[in-house]
Swiss-Prot record:
The gene is Klhdc1. Keywords: Cytoplasm, Kelch repeat, Repeat, Ubl conjugation pathway. One of its GO terms (cellular component) is Cul5-RING ubiquitin ligase complex. Substrate-recognition component of a Cul5-RING (CRL5) E3 ubiquitin-protein ligase complex of the DesCEND (destruction via C-end degrons) pathway, which recognizes a C-degron located at the extreme C terminus of target proteins, leading to their ubiquitination and degradation. The C-degron recognized by the DesCEND pathway is usually a motif of less than ten residues and can be present in full-length proteins, truncated proteins or proteolytically cleaved forms. Pathway: Protein modification; protein ubiquitination. InterPro entries: Gal_Oxase/kelch_b-propeller, Kelch-typ_b-propeller. This is Kelch domain-containing protein 1. Its main location: cytoplasm. Pfam families: Kelch_KLHDC2_KLHL20_DRC7 (PF24681). Coiled coil: none annotated.
Length: 406
């Protein structure tokens, strides 16, 4: 009988932060809907997922805690998780926090960065971040500016004339140097920048920061751009060969090799949650849709991180349109294989799936290999248990009587 406590999973959520460092996936923040109320997840909790054993664990955090938020931008440099911006009960944020993920005693302590040079971006959420040369490079997002701060890099959505505050979408670029703790806004040297936007996606390949899609006003986009992170020149909209993904926001873009990007999910222009996956090859300048993905499991405002063997780990997000039916937050982990696994990984998976049959032989393995096998057995035991629980939950939901409106 499986122990439910041992196979616990991080709570359902959307708009959270997630990064991979070493053998672990780290998840913090976000929100969930409870009885039609948006509830932020506790700011003093971080969940870790052991990629080898498939086990989740919750850690209580200390230090200068960020507020409980959604729409923050999380990025990892040298084992430190940096969280910038977001939205909480008090409004939009432009504060920057970090936590060391490589602690020896398992204690995670937040630090708020208050001593820095330069000017940080204006408060915003749903922005993106490129990590390049120990720098955090932020682009876009939705937030507010005062009348004196209005520039061409801002599309106004709403305004409070009494307070001289304007809300809208950004397309500005800001850099935080983690070594010198300095904020700067680089001078864009050329090219046509993307429209202001939020809920877009980004990824880094080489010295280029790619941007895809997002929303401005009532328009969702499917344009692809890159910014040269050395010369600060925009590419302009990239004309691709062949078919392209649909217009969308709240999707993810992940670098999977030196020349390929993986795009998944989002909300399309018709407000329909998406479950499609695409790979963009920057060498051939072509998109290719993956046909083997589970189309019954759409996701939006999720996170997608690259694992040790180039698998994509998608966690959380919503399966519903957050703008109208905000109930379908998820906590299952979708793993998409983008290339063949190593021979060792394939063998470990085979043993893990057939542990009962191979029980008498497993104990004969060398100690180092035995440890890997035992973790993989735990991985598949946990995966099967969670699958059974998910099926039962779906059957229960499907069998509930529906109330029809007259």
């Amino acid at each position: 009988m499986a122990d439910p406590q041992a196979f616990c999973v991080a709570e359902e959520r959307s708009g959270h932060c997630a990064v991979v460092d070493g053998h672990f996936l780290y998840v913090w923040g976000g929100y969930v809907s409870i009885e039609d109320n948006e509830v932020y997840l506790p700011n003093d909790e971080m969940w870790t997922y052991d990629i080898d054993s498939g086990l989740w664990k919750m850690h209580l955090m200390e230090g200068e805690l960020p507020p409980s938020m959604s729409g923050s931008c999380g990025a990892c440099i040298h084992g430190r998780l940096y969280v910038f911006g977001g939205y909480d009960d008090k409004g939009y944020s432009n504060r920057l926090y970090f936590v060391n993920l490589r602690t020896r005693d398992g204690t995670y302590t937040w630090e708020k960065i208050t001593k820095f040079d330069g000017q940080p971006p204006t408060p915003r959420d749903k922005l993106s971040c490129w990590v390049y040369k120990d720098r955090l490079i932020y682009f876009g997002g939705y937030g507010y500016r005062r009348h004196s701060e209005l520039q061409e890099c801002f599309d106004v959505h709403d305004a409070s004339w009494e307070e001289q505050i304007f809300w809208g979408w950004h397309n500005d670029v800001h850099v935080f140097d983690t070594k010198t703790r300095t904020w700067s806004q680089p001078e864009i040297k050329g090219g046509v920048p993307p429209q202001p936007r939020a809920a877009h996606s980004c990824a880094v390949l080489g010295n280029k920061g790619y941007v895809f899609g997002g929303r401005v006003l009532q328009t969702r986009m499917n344009d692809l751009h890159y910014l040269n992170l050395d010369t600060w020149v925009w590419s302009g909209r990239i004309s691709v060969n062949g078919e392209s993904p649909k217009h969308r926001s709240w999707h993810t873009l992940t670098a999977i090799t030196d020349d390929k990007l993986f795009l998944f999910g989002g909300l399309n222009a018709d407000n329909i949650p998406l479950s499609d996956g695409w790979i963009h090859n920057i060498t051939t300048n072509c998109w290719k849709q993956l046909r083997h993905l589970p189309y019954t499991r759409p996701r939006l405002w999720h996170t997608a991180c690259l694992g040790k063997e180039n698998e994509i780990m998608v966690f959380g997000g919503s399966k519903d349109n957050l703008l109208f039916l905000d109930t379908g937050h998820c906590n299952d982990l979708l793993i998409f294989q983008t290339q063949p696994y190593s021979l060792l990984r394939s063998c470990l998976d085979c043993i893990g799936k057939n542990a009962i049959i191979l029980k008498s032989q497993i104990s004969l393995l060398p100690p180092k290999l035995l440890q890997q096998v035992l973790k993989k057995i735990t991985f598949w035991t946990a995966a099967n248990y969670r699958k059974e629980q998910r099926i039962r939950k779906e059957e229960t939901e499907n069998n509930q009587p529906r109330v029809s409106s007259c």
